Amino acid sequence: MAFPKVYFDMTIDGQPAGRIVMELYTDKTPRTAENFRALCTGEKGVGGTGKPLHFKGSKFHRVIPNFMCQGGDFTAGNGTGGESIYGSKFEDENFERKHTGPGILSMANAGANTNGSQFFICTVKTDWLDGKHVVFGQVVEGLDVVKAIEKVGSSSGKPTKPVVVADCGQLS
């Protein structure tokens, strides 16, 4: 099965930082993968909040070195917002895939069944998140870009420079 591939063209402090290409696990997590794919293309238009259902222009608002890089809050931009293509929140699909190492793509949440649009990319193995966060993809190109983003992180999570998804979409 060929998994769909999506991309983020990233900027750090307004400067191009490169492309992150991710494959989405449509076999085990089809609803979660479809949500992320559609938020990369922007094809669903405007959501219930009145904001476009699109990652383009959104920030990575939380970056913690030796842990993860988190983004996807395109409504508030600070980690309090976001919206799925299914409405505000949707259920945890399953926890079959694990947080095995750098490049794992997983849903950020505020507890069980609170998935929206926020996600994170692991920079290390984060097995304590297994069974709590839905893994739905992985970085297949551009792990160096993820590492560059990680370098502008902080222990509080607030990036020292703005990290923005300048463009995004689907490759295959």
Swiss-Prot record:
Residues 7-170 form the PPIase cyclophilin-type domain. Ubiquitous. It is found in: Cytoplasm. PPIases accelerate the folding of proteins. It catalyzes the cis-trans isomerization of proline imidic peptide bonds in oligopeptides. Involved in de-etiolation. Reduces the sensitivity to brassinosteroids by decreasing somehow the abundance of the partially dephosphorylated form of BES1. Triggers the activation of bacterial AvrRpt2 protease activity upon infection by P.syringae. Activated AvrRpt2 confers virulence in plant lacking the RPS2 resistance gene. Changing residue 62 to A: Loss of PPIase activity. This is Peptidyl-prolyl cis-trans isomerase CYP18-3. Its main location: cytoplasm. One of its GO terms (biological process) is brassinosteroid mediated signaling pathway. Induction: Up-regulated by light, salt and wounding. Down-regulated by cytokinin treatment. It catalyses: [protein]-peptidylproline (omega=180) = [protein]-peptidylproline (omega=0). It comes from Arabidopsis thaliana (Mouse-ear cress).
